[in-house]
Swiss-Prot record:
Zn(2+) binds at C69, C71, C87, C90. GO terms for biological process: DNA-templated transcription. Its main location: plastid. It is an enzyme of class 2 (transferase). Keywords: Chloroplast, DNA-directed RNA polymerase, Magnesium, Metal-binding, Nucleotidyltransferase, Plastid, Transcription, Transferase, Zinc. It comes from the Eukaryota. GO terms for cellular component: chloroplast; DNA-directed RNA polymerase complex; mitochondrion. Mg(2+) binds at D489, D491, D493. It is found in: Plastid, Chloroplast. Belongs to the RNA polymerase beta' chain family. RpoC1 subfamily. InterPro entries: DNA-dir_RpoC_beta_prime, RNA_pol_asu, RNA_pol_N, RNA_pol_Rpb1_1, RNA_pol_Rpb1_3_sf, RNA_pol_Rpb1_clamp_domain, RNApol_RpoC1. This is DNA-directed RNA polymerase subunit beta'.
């Protein structure tokens, strides 16, 4: 449907029989109203034309060929001449054949039929509203027993067969004989209701507001009772309270949407447009038909049989009518959801019929395959791997994917720079992977964001924008901090990449969807770009110190058992064999690590600036050891640092005890804070 703001949308729900008739009925120019399908036939076996009033009738659903009626006469569609747009001989309008994609029909059911989705699917909406067990309702719908009409507004379920006690032997055969007489038909029609008719009568008598009020009162009474001391009784009360909550929510939904409960019982069965259930001619004079056509034919056959029985009801036994009503109910159930009641219906080749539910639900259904999961151009898909060198707003795009996604832009760049005279030559250069192609691709990608999406998209952070960077390999590289928004990890997850084409889409991607602008959860406001899994493990490994001889190395930097640094005799900084190295700056320490002079976990002493505070308080902490030198200066050794003081107790310098991993981690944090401050100052 299309609302008042011209937005196309789809609404699924219950409709009234009046609305179904309005969708299907159409008035022909001669005043005749058509729309009801009464015959189970499709095409005539000789003429190969649709049967009149059948499942492919041209009077109901429109012509097969535009402007050509069933007689074969052609009339111009939308011509200015005042020619009749209707064939009086066959009754077919001269309209576009595309009408057969949306023109519906209907089957007028001889008896009401319960919609199996609302009866058998869990939770059962009909059982919830009526507050009846599902098994009893199924027995009533499928005519296993009958329902006595309300007496003093107290409806009861009665199993009429087998409910009599034959105290007198003579009545053992006389009472069952009454159920086969003509007098019982009058009694049955007046006092007994069965099948979907009984369900519809009960649903029509419901007052939804009274249901809400009574359910709320009962829920409060159960809540005030408290625990009974019996676990089984407490669980029973809890289940009853949950049921009352579901019942109130269901009743409120019916009131809010202006839907009547009795609409869950069908009296008119919609017939899909023919183009949605086609019959295709193949070689050899054979044809392939949709399974839904066969299921519709079965419904019409049984419905017509029931109509014939009801027109001759005086001579038809009531048992036969009830049996035929059950067959109609089962045929409609199979059409809507084959196999929901047990064994599915199969064809002659033992193949299960594909019902309406099978057509629309699941991964290969109409919605997910055609509407939601539709394949689009300018998109790709690949496995994600971690990109440790990427910024938060960047993603690594493989060359093979990037050249396909941005191929049209690269072709335009080659032609504009006069490197190719036409599209064919440009494509040949791309196939040959000439160096100029990658240069133009780099220029194109610099100003063009891409969208990354991981299914299922459960919230808005399931799709975010990134600045693409060309990488080698065939996997998409991703910054690990954005994984939580996608609910992704690097164990084989796949992600789709899309290219926004219009300027509006690119602007929206840059302003609203870039990953560095989505740092907080839209649901609760907590930070969502936090280190998890691989990053936490990496930070642990990075900041993990050397555990070998930790006590001796911790308090005595001159411990000769510090064997890991023995090969550093020839370095350009002050160091003596058997001692932990001293560094004047973090650059010197990282340089020694790159030259493999020390490893990631080697403990070292790093000179600290006097204007920078040490985390621990020097004034309050007692030194572990004090070492004096010959010139009067001395070293105060603490837990994680050492202070060099002069003779007058003035502080000359401070050394902190750390590792290369800690230094790298500190520098990363420092650069991130400085970058944020610079960007903030530019923004203000």
């Amino acid at each position: 449907m299309i609302d008042q703001y011209k937005h196309q949308q789809l609404r699924i729900g219950l409709v009234s029989p009046k609305q179904i008739r309005a969708w299907a009925n159409k008035i022909l120019p001669n005043g005749e109203i058509v729309g009801e399908v009464t015959k189970p036939y499709t095409f005539h076996y000789k003429t190969n034309k649709p049967e009149k009033d059948g499942l492919f009738c041209e009077r109901i659903f429109g012509p097969i060929k535009s402007g050509i009626c069933a007689c074969g006469n052609y009339r111009v569609i939308g011509g200015e001449k005042e020619e009749p747009k209707f064939c009086e001989q066959c009754g077919v309008e001269s309209v576009d054949s595309r009408i057969r994609r949306y023109q519906m029909g209907y089957i007028k059911l001889a008896c009401p039929v319960t919609h199996v989705w609302y009866l058998k699917r869990l939770p059962s909406y009909i059982a919830n509203l009526l507050d009846k067990p599902l098994k009893e309702l199924e027995g009533l719908v499928y005519c296993d027993f009958s329902f006595a009409r309300p007496i003093a507004k107290k409806p009861t379920f009665l199993r009429l067969r087998g409910s009599f006690e034959y105290e007198i032997q003579s009545r053992k055969y006389s009472i069952p004989l009454f159920f086969t007489t003509q007098g019982f038909d009058t009694f049955r029609n007046r006092e007994i209701s069965t099948g979907a008719t009984a369900i519809r009568e009960q649903l029509a008598d419901l007052d939804l507001r009274i249901i809400i009020d009574r359910s709320l009162v009962e829920w409060k009474e159960l809540g005030e009772e408290g625990s009974t001391g019996n676990d089984w009784e407490d669980r029973k009360i809890g289940r009853r309270k949950d049921f009352l909550v579901r019942r109130m929510e269901l009743a409120k939904h019916f009131l809010r949407t202006n839907v009547e409960p009795e609409w869950m019982v069908l009296s008119l069965l919609p017939v899909l447009p023919p183009e949605l259930r086609p019959i295709i001619q193949i070689d050899g004079g054979k044809s392939m038909s949709s399974d839904i056509n066969e299921l519709y034919r079965r419904v019409i056959y049984r419905n017509n049989t029931l109509t014939d029985l009801l027109t001759t009801s005086r001579s038809t036994p009531g048992e036969l009518v009830m049996c035929q009503e059950k067959l109609v109910q089962e045929a409609v159930d199979t059409l809507l959801d084959n196999g929901i009641r047990g064994q599915p219906m199969r064809d002659g080749h033992n193949k299960v019929y594909k019902s309406f539910s099978d057509v629309i639900e699941g991964k290969e259904g109409r919605f997910r395959e055609t509407l939601l999961g539709k394949r689009v151009d300018y998109s790709g898909r690949s496995v994600i791997v971690v990109g440790p060198s990427l910024s938060l707003h960047q993603c690594g795009l493989p060359r093979e994917i990037a050249i396909e996604l941005f191929q049209t832009f690269v072709i335009r760049g080659l032609i504009r720079q006069h490197l190719a005279s036409n599209i064919g030559l440009a494509k040949s250069k791309i196939r040959e992977k000439e160096p100029i192609v990658w240069e133009i691709l780099q220029e194109v990608m610099q100003g063009h964001p891409v969208l990354l999406n991981r299914a299922p998209t459960l919230h808005r952070l399931g799709i975010q924008a990134f600045q693409p960077i060309l990488v080698e390999g065939r996997a998409i590289c991703l910054h690990p901090l954005v994984c939580k928004g996608f609910n992704a990890d690097f164990d084989g997850d796949q992600m789709a990449v899309h290219v926004p084409l219009s300027l509006e889409a690119q602007a929206e991607a840059r302003l609203l969807m870039f990953s560095h602008t989505n740092l907080l959860s839209p649901a609760i406001g907590d930070p969502i770009s936090v280190p998890t899994q691989d990053m936490l493990m990496g930070l642990y490994v990075l900041t993990m110190g050397n555990r070998r001889g930790i006590c001796a190395n911790r308090y005595n930097p001159c411990n000769p058992r510090n064997h890991q640094n023995e090969r550093m005799d020839h370095s350009n900084y002050e160091y003596r064999k058997g001692k932990e190295p001293y560094f004047c700056s973090s650059y010197d320490a990282l340089g020694a690590y790159r030259q493999k002079g020390i490893d990631l976990y080697s403990t070292l002493w790093l000179r600290w600036r006097l204007d920078q505070r040490v985390i621990a308080s020097i004034n309050r902490e007692v030194p572990i050891e004090v070492q004096y030198e010959s010139l009067g200066t001395y070293h105060e050794i603490y837990d994680h640092y050492r202070v060099v003081r002069s003779v007058k107790k003035g502080m000359l310098c401070i050394y902190i005890r750390t590792t290369v991993g800690h230094i790298s981690f500190y520098r990363e944090i420092e650069e991130a804070i400085q970058g944020f401050c610079r960007s903030y100052s530019y923004g203000t």
